[in-house]
Amino acid sequence: MGDLMKKHEMTEEDIKLQFITPAIEGAGWDKQKQIRMEYNFTDGRVIVRGNVTARGKRKRTDYLLYYKPNIPLAIVEAKDNRHSVGAGMQQAIEYAEVLDIPFVYSSNGDGFLEHDMKTGKERELTLEQFPSPQDLWQRHIGDEHFTPEQEQLITEPYYFQPGDKTPRYYQRIAINRTVDAVARGQDRILLVMATGTGKTYTAFQIIHRLWKSGRKKKILFLADRNILVNQTMQQDFKPFAKVMTKIEGKKLDSSYELYLSLYQQLAGDENEEPFRAFQPDFFDLIVIDECHRGSAKEDSRWRRILEYFHSATQIGMTATPKETKEVSNISYFGEPIYTYSLKQGIDDGFLAPYKVLRVGLDKDLEGWRPTAGQHDIYGYEIEDREYNTKDYDKNLIIDERTTAVAKRITRFLKENDRFAKTIVFCVDIDHAERMRQALVNENSDLVAENAKYVMRITGDNAEGKAQLDYFIAEDSKYPVIVTTSKLMTTGVDCKTCRLIVLDNNINSMTEFKQIIGRGTRLKPDYGKEYFTIMDFRNACRLFADPEFDGDPISIIDDNDDPGEEPTANPPKPPVPTPGPGGDTDDPPEKKHKFRVRGVEVSILNERVQYYDKDGKLITESVTDYSKKNILGEYATLDSFLRAWNSEEKKQAIIDELQERGILLEALRQIAGNKDIDDFDLICHIAYDKAPLTKAERANNVRKRGYLYKYSGLAQEVLSALLDKYMNEGIQDIENLEILSNDPFRKFGTPMKIAKLFGGKNGYIQAIRDLQKEIYAA
């Protein structure tokens, strides 16, 4: 009975150490190679309010059990013995669904409850009955009837060298599902992964496992931008250096094993198809990066490459599967075997969230109409009708509008960081050039220091395109602001981009997703934990479209913008021919654009929107949002006071509110008073209570004579703690580690200080009493 009571009183950590871990190891699981404890599989969502950011909680499993590295079989969720054996099951199942794990276990140290994700059945096991790795593996593949060759393929190790990054959970799922599909004989495979989630690294591991197993010996990697191919060879595909080549010109060397090429390089034109230099069965595997950009279009020259090598396994990878009358990824590749969306990436903390600044110019919201018989600056009579954002910079140019946009961009950068990498998306090349000029004039001081502060990077401009590598390089200061049209909508890995400006008309969901993807990469060491979208043309309405972040479905969208498809063989001038990388931009408009000056343009309204915990844009002010969510958790002041007073560590309440998107530091900045205590800030925002400063609360404690309950050194310690609260906040005095720092060192070691209060428990009780006194009024 004594032992039972002892077990019942154990912490969860003790239960794991003394019962669960020994049971798992006793079943044959290798502690070093097959058991991963305290596995954090997300980084915690980045929460943004104002300019303040914080991380949400990371998701974590107690145990993740592997058959082989990166081939997980089971999750074990532990609870202390005061819980039932199955108390952790629901949370474990939720994690198993995310992590693609076939078996789930919950334990309180008495035994295990098992849940089979494939059959849905559950059973209880004793500690001694926990299954071995081989038992679970055979159950997992039992219905598949794999041949030895197939099993060897699906267990082929990942490429790994000491110091290498390890795959994130979603990359591991994408890699394993793809290799499994190939093992089963599937020859058309589609993977959908949001921009910035490591598609190229995922492709590398897939290719390496298939190549190393001997299943695929000749491999083609197709991309549509030179920079994509070069980045791939220099970074993720570097381990293939000795067997890898880039197809250039007409030299096709068949001695390599991995070939990288632009679609355009292999496709050629109607009369010349370089891909035919290879035999149709030359390649075993073709991986198509950004496959939405034309490979699945039935009449495209790129599609002919895929059909020519029809016997090869073909894997399409994209952030934005395209489904229109002309193009269908799904009808060609089939349903995606795995989708990892932008929302998932942001929720997991692997992608940067965004805040949206919507700017309403008066001429955009109200329209503009010429006076009767009005001529433009070139002498053309302007067609008499009302013009709006669909016309601006396409049919009609208002110079003052361009200036107004440039001024607002510049003001934003001056208020935040003038060297924040910025991409301005324009209607066409002509608009991008005029916007460049306007931004140069608004930032002439920095342009005088370095002419590359503002650059136009478009398909027709060799000088601008030459600066693209410098723009995306993390250690390169210039260019800072780039104006563009189509060239930078996809494939540009600019981790440091912190401002995206939309001054173009976007009707294509595919293009919208790709543009937003330019900013979603996190770079905390660069100071980038979120990015801002400045929207002048209401493009962000597409965020509300269920199609924006849902699973891809086969749809018809007659409004899809055909202008985003690149071409390898453009018409004769004045349309610009593509550069060496096949990159093209919009051709100049042949129709005359009216251009006017002397039109007064002003900002009519602005609103800031934040990405909330549900993945939606909220328009409320930080204060209003915080008040609503605090009241959602604590409806009355009394309920909040009860929770605050009953919580031993006040930080737990702060953390809970933070998970709901309430950042007290942002509220403190808005209030303009750094000396307000967290408690007072919450009461002031949510319940309209007049706040006291920390100094006022500390002085009230002293005035009431509370410290005189103690004498000697104990009183001095509490007085020092009260000073610490006044200067730092309640979280500091809750932390026992502060006793190891000044000014407490003069009182002795933490153990010696605790003895002044009768021991550790007495010290903790003294801290609780001090907290009650602090918040007594």
Regions found by a protein language model. Give the residues of each.
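Conserved C-terminal RecA-like helicase domain
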Residues: E257, N388-V482
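SF2 helicase catalytic motif II
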Residues: R276-I315
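Structural recognition of the conserved hydrophobic beta-strand(s) that form the central parallel beta-sheet
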Residues: Y105-S107, Y259-L262, T313-T318, V482-T483
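A conserved SF2-helicase RecA2
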Residues: K343-D348, A352, L522-G579, P587-F594, ...
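Catalytic cores and motor modules of nucleic-acid processing enzymes
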Residues: L413-K414, H431-M435, N443, Y453, ...
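Conserved RecA-like P-loop NTPase helicase motor core
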Residues: R82, Q265, R293, M455-P562
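Interdomain helical connector at the RecA1-RecA2 junction of SF1/SF2 helicase-like NTPases
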Residues: V327-A420
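ATP-dependent helicase/translocase motor core
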Residues: G2-K218, A223, I227-K242, S254-L258, ...
